[in-house]
Amino acid sequence: MKSPWISGLRSVSLTVPDLAAAETFYTQTWGLTVADRSWGTIYFRGSGNDHHLLALHEADGTPQLRLVTLRARSAAALDHIAQAAVAAGGTVERRGAAADPAGGSVLLIRDPDGRRIEVVHGDAQRANDAPVPKDQPIRLAHAVLNSHAVEATREFFEKALGFVLADRTRIMAFMNCDNDHHTIALGDTDNDALNHVAFLMPTLDAVMRGGGRLKDFGLPPQWGPGRHGPGDNAFNYFVDPFGIVIEYTAEIEQIDETYQAGRPEDWTWPTGRIDQWGIGQMPTDHLKQAQRRVLFMPQLD
């Protein structure tokens, strides 16, 4: 179940109204490290190979999602995606050298509903020769994007980017591009906001310790801890100081071509439970509201 063109999710780029406060939170509490900075922008990395996994740009008002960056398997994949995206109803906004410090060649596309997806190849990657810190995110695990028309959005990701449906629940389509069960998921809602971004932690213990660290900071879990059905991953959800939903996750299921996609009737829960464990905080109203408020930026600077 691999995309022939996309190998994974590299990073997300968002705006925040207070960059200094964001740096403090994401380094001292969330566990990232500053990889680079430029005027009005900070790039954060985890312990993995990616040059950065989060780019935050200072801008007034409610946070907005600038773009989601996927990594291409080859330079030739960029050519194929450019053609396939247009054939699937999308547009190509830019092709050329990357504007961020990771470098490489990029293709920037928009789907028919305006979601901005960047695909990069040849970007800088760090040597992975140091011990993994026990409580630091390694890389991004997935991003969940809301969609008012999930099946149409799913079709675009399949045709333009080569994603494959891993599982379909009543409220979400889980999209696969490599060994991780899902890299993108599409939430069945009435808007097209960013639902959340998930950061992969090295262990279940790291997910739990991270939850304690956030609670000490004054941000208790807004959902969890728990273990999902599709993906079988442990989770802890939080809303950051700016209203962005972020997740610690670990132990995501690894799948291959033999995996059979589940249907909504395959993923049901007893009354009062929406995950395998059923012991953690149920999704709060604060979380549900935050999952609808971070929209894609209409135009890049």
Feature locations, PLM:
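N-terminal beta-strand motif that seeds the catalytic metal site of vicinal oxygen chelate
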Residues: 1-20, 65-70, 122-151, 164, ...
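Active-site-adjacent scaffolding segments
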Residues: 41-52, 57-143, 172-173
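Vicinal oxygen chelate
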Residues: 15-20, 69-113, 148-151, 199-246, ...
